[in-house]
Amino acid sequence: MITAEKKKKNKFLPNFDKQSIYSLRFDEMQNWLVEQGQQKFRAKQIFEWLYQKRVDSIDEMTNLSKDLRQLLKDNFTVTTLTTVVKQESKDGTIKFLFELQDGYTIETVLMRHDYGNSVCVTTQVGCRIGCTFCASTLGGLKRNLEAGEIVSQVLTVQKALDATEERVSQIVIMGIGEPFENYDEMMGFLRIVNDDNSLNIGARHITVSTSGIIPRIYDFADEDIQINFAVSLHAAKDEVRSRLMPINRAYNVEKLIEAIQYYQEKTNRRVTFEYGLFGGVNDQLEHARELAHLIKGLNCHVNLIPVNHVPERNYVKTAKNDIFKFEKELKRLGINATIRREQGSDIDAACGQLRAKERQVETR
């Protein structure tokens, strides 16, 4: 639930008259109902309407009294996202351009795998981290999303899947924005979708990725939640990483590894390192050796990502043969590594390509 204190703390949150009903955890809904003089068990009914029947309005909750429905409408909105554009890739990946209630736009991606359907969600409108290879950061940060707006992305995709009786089985928090810069709303989202009373998506089927906001890595390590954790690394040396990711000037590689060691001591969980390969920048065998030396001894996996084309950026994709050589060298040095399957690059839905492109074109 978004309180006045939360808004004061998070200056990039929207200032809507009513908050999204999807921003409430089940226990928060129970507590709110009791505070309003209502019966606690109504929370179960409300969540069934929201997450199982997936209604679009409070008026559709017909087993609630008219007075309770009015009370809910007076205090909350059922956040609905307007689908501006829906594009499907030749590999089955679907990208949604959603419009929020204040007119801003975000992108969300549905990826189909043999093991199920995965949704890549966005946590911010824009991004201020400034990675020099990424489209998401080109327009800067506009605002943070409420937890309910992140939940709504998953629900809207799930509604699209209902027609074919499919379900969202995995969530990756790797869309537009830096999740750890919207930490409280991200954690609220995680606890909501993981709850048995809502979408009931298992913690080990959810992955959150960060560019390396070190104070929040320590916070995340202290959370009692078994979410998968990934770190965008992209280089083992500060000089190269700072060129790719200016955030490294504030949180350098040495401090980042220390934070990851703390995370593993607290959680005993594996970390995934995301390593984008940029032609002539970080893709040589010497870079593989530097990476192996840096992370040796950590319980980790390296996800090698061929760079995706962004018109405003000058990076080029590493040759396929060099990608295989890089992977082979890591494995020779005892590092668990795989090459990420490319999905959605033909519709600008792949890693580093997400932004509100269509809406920007329309409003010029």
From Swiss-Prot:
Asked if Cytoplasm is a keyword of the record, the answer is yes
Q: Which InterPro entries match?
A: Aldolase_TIM, Methyltransferase_A, RlmN_N, RNA_MTrfase_RlmN, rRNA_lsu_MTrfase_RlmN/Cfr, rSAM
Q: Which residues bind [4Fe-4S] cluster?
A: C127, C131, C134
Q: GO terms for molecular function, please?
A: 4 iron, 4 sulfur cluster binding; metal ion binding; rRNA (adenine(2503)-C2-)-methyltransferase activity; rRNA binding; tRNA (adenine(37)-C2)-methyltransferase activity; tRNA binding
For S-adenosyl-L-methionine, which residues are the binding ones?
Answer: G177, E178, S209, S232, L233, H234, N308
Disulfide bond positions: C120-C351
Q: Name one Pfam family in it.
A: Radical_SAM
The Radical SAM core domain covers which part of the protein? 113-346
Quote the subcellular location field of this record.
Cytoplasm
* The keyword Nucleus appears for this protein: no
Active-site residues are E107, C351
GO cellular component annotations of the record = cytoplasm
Q: How is the cofactor bound?
A: Binds 1 [4Fe-4S] cluster. The cluster is coordinated with 3 cysteines and an exchangeable S-adenosyl-L-methionine.
The organism's place on the tree of life at top rank = Bacteria
Keywords (alphabetical) are: 4Fe-4S, Antibiotic resistance, Cytoplasm, Disulfide bond, Iron, Iron-sulfur, Metal-binding, Methyltransferase, rRNA processing, S-adenosyl-L-methionine, Transferase, tRNA processing
- Catalytic activities: adenosine(2503) in 23S rRNA + 2 reduced [2Fe-2S]-[ferredoxin] + 2 S-adenosyl-L-methionine = 2-methyladenosine(2503) in 23S rRNA + 5'-deoxyadenosine + L-methionine + 2 oxidized [2Fe-2S]-[ferredoxin] + S-adenosyl-L-homocysteine; adenosine(37) in tRNA + 2 reduced [2Fe-2S]-[ferredoxin] + 2 S-adenosyl-L-methionine = 2-methyladenosine(37) in tRNA + 5'-deoxyadenosine + L-methionine + 2 oxidized [2Fe-2S]-[ferredoxin] + S-adenosyl-L-homocysteine
* Any single biological process term in GO: rRNA base methylation
Which coenzymes or cofactors are required?
[4Fe-4S] cluster
Which EC number(s) does UniProt give?
2.1.1.192
The free-text function statement in the UniProt record for this protein reads: Specifically methylates position 2 of adenine 2503 in 23S rRNA and position 2 of adenine 37 in tRNAs. Confers resistance to some classes of antibiotics.
Q: Extra notes? A: Reaction proceeds by a ping-pong mechanism involving intermediate methylation of a conserved cysteine residue.
Tell me which PANTHER family the record gives. Answer: 23S RRNA METHYLTRANSFERASE (PTHR30544), RADICAL SAM CORE DOMAIN-CONTAINING PROTEIN (PTHR30544:SF5)
NCBIfam families membership = rRNA_mod_RlmN
Would you identify the family this protein belongs to, as annotated?
Belongs to the radical SAM superfamily. RlmN family.
Quote the protein name from its UniProt record. Probable dual-specificity RNA methyltransferase RlmN
Q: Which organism is it from?
A: Staphylococcus aureus (strain bovine RF122 / ET3-1)
